[in-house]
Swiss-Prot record:
Belongs to the FdhD family. This is Sulfur carrier protein FdhD. Keywords: Cytoplasm, Molybdenum cofactor biosynthesis. The lineage of its organism: Bacteria, Pseudomonadati, Pseudomonadota, Gammaproteobacteria, Enterobacterales. GO terms for molecular function: sulfur carrier activity; sulfurtransferase activity. It comes from Escherichia fergusonii (strain ATCC 35469 / DSM 13698 / CCUG 18766 / IAM 14443 / JCM 21226 / LMG 7866 / NBRC 102419 / NCTC 12128 / CDC 0568-73). Gene3D superfamilies: 3.10.20.10, Cytidine Deaminase, domain 2 (3.40.140.10).
Length: 278
C-alpha cells in the first residue's frame, strides 16, 4: 500500500460535513426553503487490505478517527505501529486504508471481528458477549482537577462544533486543561467517533494525557469510558448521564467519571479523590 504523509491525507478529507437540502417548516408547508443538514457516511477501516469495521461518521478528520479507534480498541499500542494511511472514496462511502506493522496485524487477525455500525456504535457485530469488555490497566492517580474550572469549559464546548452550530446534529469531544481552557476538540455525528478523533489527534501530536481531562457533549456509555481509559485518560466529564456499565468499568480501571455537567452542577460517579471543589 502506498505510504501517505499526514498532510496529504488531510487534503483528501477536507470536507465540511454539511450539505444543503430543501425542507419545509411546520408553520409554512407550502413553501420549501434551503437549510443545512449534517452529512453521515459509511467509513470503512481497512487494515492491510482487510476490512475490519464500518462506522457511520462525519466525513472529516478521518485520519484522526482511524488512529484513535486503533488505539482505543487495542489494535495498536502507539502511532508508530501504523506505517501508512490513505483515505479514498469507495462505492458507497469512504475507506481509510491503514498499513499496520506485521506484529500488530497478526494480533488483529487473532481477534478480528466484523462490525457493521449504527452511528458511532462500537459493539455492533461482536461475535460473542465475552468480546465486549477489554482488559484495561488500572489508571494511576497523578492529578487533581478543580471543579470550579469546569463551568468556563462548558460554555466554550460549542466552539468546537461548527457543523453542530449549523445543523444541531453533532457531538463534541475536547481536551480540557486544569485551568478550564479547551485546547483541542473534534465533532462528529457519532459520539464515539468524536472521541476517537480527539484521542487520535492528541496521540499523533504526542500530547500527555496527564494534567487535564476529556469533556464530551454526550452521555457516558461504557465504550466512552473504556476508550478513554485505553489511552490513559484519568478523568472523563460528560454533559449527560452515565450508564451502569460505564460506572462499573470506570470504577474498575480507576477512571474518575463525572456526568450531568452543567454550569454549577456535576455528578461524580467514581473516584472523587482526583477532584477539588472549594
Amino acid at each position: 500500500m502506498k505510504k501517505t504523509q499526514q498532510k496529504e491525507i488531510k487534503n483528501v478529507t477536507n470536507i465540511t460535513g454539511v450539505r444543503q437540502i430543501e425542507l419545509w417548516r411546520r408553520d409554512d408547508l407550502q413553501h420549501p426553503r434551503i437549510d443545512e443538514v449534517a452529512e453521515e457516511v459509511p467509513v470503512a477501516l481497512v487494515y492491510n487490505g482487510i476490512s475490519h469495521v464500518v462506522m457511520m461518521a462525519s466525513p472529516k478528520d478521518l485520519e484522526y478517527f482511524a488512529l484513535g479507534f486503533s488505539l482505543s480498541e487495542g489494535i495498536i499500542e502507539s502511532p508508530r505501529d501504523i506505517f501508512g494511511m490513505d483515505v479514498v472514496p469507495s462505492c458507497n462511502g469512504l475507506e481509510v486504508q491503514i498499513e499496520l506493522s506485521s506484529r500488530r496485524f497478526m494480533g488483529l487477525k487473532e481477534r478480528r471481528r466484523a462490525l457493521a455500525g449504527r452511528t458511532g456504535c462500537g459493539v455492533c457485530g461482536v461475535e460473542q458477549l465475552n468480546d465486549i469488555g477489554k482488559p484495561v490497566q488500572p489508571l494511576p492517580f497523578t492529578q487533581a482537577f478543580d471543579l470550579n474550572k469546569l463551568d468556563d469549559a462548558l460554555r466554550h464546548l460549542n466552539d468546537f462544533q461548527p457543523v453542530g452550530q449549523l445543523t444541531g446534529c453533532t457531538h463534541a469531544a475536547a481536551w480540557m486543561l486544569p485551568s478550564g481552557e479547551l485546547v483541542g476538540g473534534h465533532e462528529d455525528v457519532g459520539r464515539h467517533v468524536a472521541l476517537d478523533k480527539l484521542l487520535g489527534r492528541r496521540s499523533q501530536e504526542g500530547e500527555s494525557w496527564q494534567q487535564g481531562a476529556v469533556l464530551v457533549s454526550s452521555r457516558a456509555s461504557y465504550e466512552m469510558v473504556q476508550k478513554s481509559a485505553m489511552c490513559g485518560v484519568e478523568i472523563l466529564f460528560a454533559v449527560s448521564a452515565a450508564t451502569t456499565l460505564a460506572v462499573e468499568v470506570a470504577e474498575r480501571c480507576n477512571l474518575t467519571l463525572v456526568g450531568f455537567c452543567k454550569p454549577g452542577r456535576a455528578t461524580v460517579y467514581t473516584h472523587p479523590q482526583r477532584l477539588i471543589h472549594n
